[in-house]
């Protein structure tokens, strides 16, 4: 898929993996719409890149559709890179012997899994109306995590939501094959994002040393590079690609 002159929506594009992806896609000639929370720095990031910002919640159809409208006003929507998500720790039984919070679990799953389904279905419906170009109408890149495979203690809402995205990928690719829309997922390992930046330096160093090779945190530009490759390679479809330096997460 050639995205030069096409529109692309990047969710979670105000920071981290999403911001790096928006930057890379803009450099490739795409007309990028950044979808992120209204409270995020997305407007400034978009202004710096010459992109468009739409404040939205990925679980809200109306605001997601507003971002998709903004993209289609620029050019046909040919790609989605869905990076938006959140963390949140829940233990099945807490230190006092109480059951883990159902509300906290639902909140993480709603953003990470329901939000992914919502954005994917709405974007795919737009792409399905595109003209077919070289056998394709659109590409959707989703974001899971290595936690889908090796979730750590306390990560049960995050891990199960990300595992849901992994499970969604092949089914979605098969579902959309007749529409000539591809769906592929990236499962990042430990990346140098704003979430990890809040950790003490010694903790960050320890995390980096746990990665076999290269023994460092991933950088968002490496995620962006893979996202662009997925978009441009027509045989990448229905697969979840680990981007993790061969790490396998320990229980804690």
Give the residues covered by each predicted segment:
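C-terminal substrate-recognition "lid" of short-chain dehydrogenase/reductases
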Residues: 219-243, 248
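Catalytic Tyr-x(3-8)-Lys segment
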Residues: 110, 202-222
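Residue(s) in the substrate-gating loop at a strand-loop-helix junction
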Residues: 145
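Conserved mid-core segment of classical short-chain dehydrogenase/reductases
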Residues: 86-106, 125, 129-134, 154-157, ...
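Catalytic Tyr-X3-Lys loop
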Residues: 86, 98-118, 141, 165
């Amino acid at each position: 898929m050639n995205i030069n002159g096409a529109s692309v929506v990047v969710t979670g594009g105000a920071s981290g993996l999403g911001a790096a992806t928006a930057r890379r896609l803009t450099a490739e000639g795409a007309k990028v719409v950044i979808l992120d929370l209204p409270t995020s720095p997305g407007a400034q990031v978009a202004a710096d890149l010459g992109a468009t910002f739409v404040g939205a919640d990925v679980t809200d159809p109306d605001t997601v559709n507003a971002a998709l409208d903004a993209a289609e006003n620029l050019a046909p929507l040919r790609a989605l890179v869905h990076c938006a998500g959140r963390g949140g720790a829940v233990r099945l039984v807490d230190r006092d012997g109480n059951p883990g919070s159902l509300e906290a679990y639902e909140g993480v799953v709603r953003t990470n899994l329901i939000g992914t389904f919502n954005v994917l279905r709405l974007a795919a419906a737009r792409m399905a109306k595109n003209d077919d170009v070289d056998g394709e109408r659109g590409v959707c890149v989703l974001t899971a995590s290595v936690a889908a495979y090796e979730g750590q203690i306390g990560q049960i809402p995050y891990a199960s939501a990300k595992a849901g995205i992994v499970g969604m990928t092949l089914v979605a690719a098969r579902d959309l094959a007749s529409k000539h829309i591809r769906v592929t997922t990236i499962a990042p390992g430990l990346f140098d994002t704003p979430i990890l930046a809040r950790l003490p330096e010694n903790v960050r160093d320890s995390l980096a040393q746990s990665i076999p090779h290269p023994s460092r945190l991933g950088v968002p530009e490496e995620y962006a590079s893979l996202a662009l490759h997925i978009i441009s390679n027509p045989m990448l479809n229905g697969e979840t690609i680990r981007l993790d330096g061969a790490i396998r997460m320990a229980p804690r």
